[in-house]
Amino acid sequence: MESLNALLQGMGLMHLGAGQAIMLLVSLLLLWLAIAKKFEPLLLLPIGFGGLLSNIPEAGMALTALESLLAHHDAGQLAVIAAKLNCAPDVHAIKEALALALPSVQNQMENLAVDMGYTPGVLALFYKVAIGSGVAPLVIFMGVGAMTDFGPLLANPRTLLLGAAAQFGIFATVLGALTLNYFGLIAFTLPQAAAIGIIGGADGPTAIYLSGKLAPELLGAIAVAAYSYMALVPLIQPPIMRALTSEKERKIRMVQLRTVSKREKILFPVVLLLLVALLLPDAAPLLGMFCFGNLMRESGVVERLSDTVQNGLINIVTIFLGLSVGAKLVADKFLQPQTLGILLLGVIAFGIGTAAGVLMAKLLNLCSKNKINPLIGSAGVSAVPMAARVSNKVGLESDAQNFLLMHAMGPNVAGVIGSAIAAGVMLKYVLAM
């Protein structure tokens, strides 16, 4: 009987909590959205599978060595950790003390747990290497740069303003999160509000990079919200675009884009990086990788490197990035009131960014002979190239011969630049406080 009892107690099913069961269902939902509905499958599939692995009871695949120690509830070991942190020797008190401790102290406690015989789970290791270091989002940004054509933006520089206007959704959402906190509805700190706000940029790697720096405890919810809403751009944007434009405005035909020279395309990423990085060094990591990837593409002298970055490298990193985000889909981190706030603020951020881009296009038309179709303003959110395709689709509904795709790629690419700069602004001023 003892052997049978030990066997039963060793089964993960016997230790399955309500929170873990809910998160397993959430992870299955993400897999269904990725496979059946094709919602951002490149990220949602590994994120969903990472969520499954993270919530298997007793497996500990997403736990660090210290978290494994705390889950083991050994009184003697807890007493040693508590003595180092000057707190009560119980799990709750130790977690609170760790949350307030300096990173150096947290690392010291992690090393102490390793010395006691605990090892981090494989997903925790993935997270430390891929996101904790900030490497994975930066490599993906390099790949995105290698796949980006700045031609439409250079051919019509005014569209840079549309991309900039769309970033208004980011800062409006930061204010929204702080407002929720002010009225006591949902508690958000300033770093958490900044990390949530970047969802409005519709740029997954930037959202992961910034939340990993400012609010790693919210990374899972922020990443899921960012990629889910990016997939829902064809549903979120059109009603806003139609509401803010007249039939006449939607029929505006834009002049043919000029041909952009090879020299312009080579110089642009270098000049862009120097201008922005010298003024805002905190934006240099994201924008630097983006511009480097684009320079490899446009220079034409490193085609092998450019091809590797666009295909093999970005695919490999995407796998580990998704699994690493899935490591944060654990019940005690995800099933919080803050998650609902993140999902609500995320969709509001998309809406405000879309509206701001459209309204900026209408404003530019007041002082310009060459009219801009306001529909391309919505492409200022950096969901590349989906937002540009949505602008083209809505335009074709009003005029079947009015093709806006290439025009919309200008603000779409500008949105990528804008979201990277916005992330740099957040890092500079939030971390300085």
UniProtKB/Swiss-Prot annotation:
Q: What does this protein do?
A: Catalyzes the decarboxylation of oxaloacetate coupled to Na(+) translocation.
The record's EC number reads 7.2.4.2
Q: What is this protein called?
A: Oxaloacetate decarboxylase beta chain 1
**InterPro entries assigned to the protein according to its UniProt record, in alphabetical order:** OadB_MmdB (IPR005661)
Q: Which family does it belong to?
A: Belongs to the GcdB/MmdB/OadB family.
Query: Biological process GO annotation list?
Result: sodium ion transport
The record ties this protein, via PANTHER family, to: OXALOACETATE DECARBOXYLASE BETA CHAIN 2 (PTHR35806:SF1)
Q: Which top EC class applies here?
A: translocase
Going by the UniProt record, its keywords in alphabetical order are: Cell membrane, Ion transport, Membrane, Sodium, Sodium transport, Translocase, Transmembrane, Transmembrane helix, Transport
Q: Where on the tree of life does the source sit, at the highest rank? A: Bacteria
Please provide, alphabetically and separated by semicolons, the GO molecular function terms listed in this UniProt record.
decarboxylation-driven active transmembrane transporter activity; lyase activity
What cofactor is needed?
A: Na(+)
The membrane-spanning stretches of this chain are: 13-35, 42-64, 125-147, 160-182, 214-236, 266-288, 308-327, 339-361, 413-432
> What membrane topology was assigned to this protein in its record?
Multi-pass membrane protein
Q: Which gene encodes it?
A: oadB1
Has UniProt tagged this entry with the keyword Transmembrane helix?
yes
Which reaction is this enzyme known to catalyze? oxaloacetate + 2 Na(+)(in) + H(+) = pyruvate + 2 Na(+)(out) + CO2
One Pfam entry name: OAD_beta
Native source species: Salmonella typhi
Q: Subunit structure, per the record?
A: Heterotrimer of an alpha, a beta and a gamma subunit.
Localisation per UniProt entry: Cell membrane
Q: Which is one Gene Ontology cellular component term of this protein?
A: plasma membrane
